[in-house]
Amino acid sequence: MNDIAHNLAQVRDKISGAAARCGRAPEEVTLLAVSKTKPASAIEEAIAAGQRAFGENYVQEGVEKINHFQQAGVSGLQWHFIGPLQSNKSRLVAEHFDWCHTVDRLPLYRSPLKVLIQINISDEQSKSGIPLEALDGLAAEIAELPHLELRGLMAIPAPESEYVRQFAVARQMAVAFARLKTRYPTVDTLSLGMSDDMEAAIAAGSTMVRIGTAIFGARDYSK
């Protein structure tokens, strides 16, 4: 078993354990492998180990990888854009990716896309997203657009070392997610939790965790 396959197995075991501890089935939580800055060869190893959903932060890099695997005839992959959504790159995201996790305003593009509304749950100026109180308005606007499929919410909470505080923030997201589900039948995804807060996020109700370094190793931003 290579390193990436081994790492994936360990992460999946952690997800299963976290789900079991709060009475949930592991199948309720999707693992999104964050492959930003990683070469196609690393993604190929993950695919060989059964991984199908990948997250990319940079539009051009992601598009190149998507094209690579399409040209190679690899099917069944899901590509999620999880980086800040710039207006001048939104068309490329809609044309190439299956999902966008970082919608925080009404998109201008017209290509079909599954979208998550990003919530700035910790009210950080350095992060994108809308405050929770703005959710109802943006969700209603997105629901009116037939080419967009509103699937749920995403958040990147401020780092917290204590589980209790991680869980408290995650519960705020889970409550908002549950309320959104009652209004829109397509809503089924709460993208919440990374390596350091995955267990609290799953306990609170996350349905998708975003894991990168624990699978692919440290990132090289120099390239």
In which residue ranges do the predicted regions lie?
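Conserved alpha/beta-domain cores
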Residues: 1-196, 204
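Expand to "…catalyze enediolate/carbanion chemistry for C-C bond making/breaking, isomerization
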Residues: 199-203, 211, 215-222
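Conserved N-terminal glycine/acidic-rich loop preference
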Residues: 208
